């Protein structure tokens, strides 16, 4: 998963894909936090991409869904799992998801803009010891995120100053 939950570690997706290929392994990534709007793992060489559709894609907290996309070389793996284990959405859930997908980019990019502003604000806040957001140049994965993503996402994590009583 990159960015990871909860401290938004960034993994070099292209290097993971190359390493997997060099050892004859199938590469797999959870792209939930980035979404296909800002990170395209297939273009970076990943074979199978998992995407939760519950939060960002759904957008209204009224569905539980997910998606798996595979390269043509690996689509049979996904088809076999789907056929043998299941995984189809109900008609109604599919309709709710389709409804929400129409506004995904508007919602996501507005949230990302707010995340950038909030991260900038929190960076200068005395009550915060540490902030995790790949959009900040101080983030250890900033350069990798900048290389492989078309934005830095909407999730921010932070640690309160030890002297602050959270109660």
What is the meaning of each model-derived region?
Residues 2-127, 132, 143:
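Conserved PLP-enzyme active-site core in the AAT-like
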Residues 116-167:
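Conserved small-domain helix->loop->beta segment predominantly found in fold-type I
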């Amino acid at each position: 998963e990159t960015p990871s939950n909860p401290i938004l570690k960034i993994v070099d997706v292209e290097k993971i894909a190359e390493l997997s290929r060099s050892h004859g392994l199938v590469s797999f990534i959870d792209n939930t936090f980035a979404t296909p709007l800002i990170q395209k793992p297939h273009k970076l060489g990943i074979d199978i991409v998992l995407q939760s559709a519950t939060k960002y894609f759904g957008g209204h907290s009224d569905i539980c869904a997910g998606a798996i996309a595979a390269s043509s070389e690996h689509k049979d793996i996904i088809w076999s799992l789907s056929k043998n284990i299941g995984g189809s959405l109900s008609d109604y859930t599919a309709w709710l998801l389709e409804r929400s997908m129409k506004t995904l980019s508007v919602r996501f990019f507005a949230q990302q803009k707010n995340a950038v502003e909030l991260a900038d604000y929190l960076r200068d806040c005395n009550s915060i010891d540490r902030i995790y957001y790949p959009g900040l140049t101080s983030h250890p994965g900033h350069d990798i995120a900048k290389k492989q993503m078309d934005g830095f996402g909407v999730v921010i994590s932070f640690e309160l100053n030890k002297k602050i009583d959270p109660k």
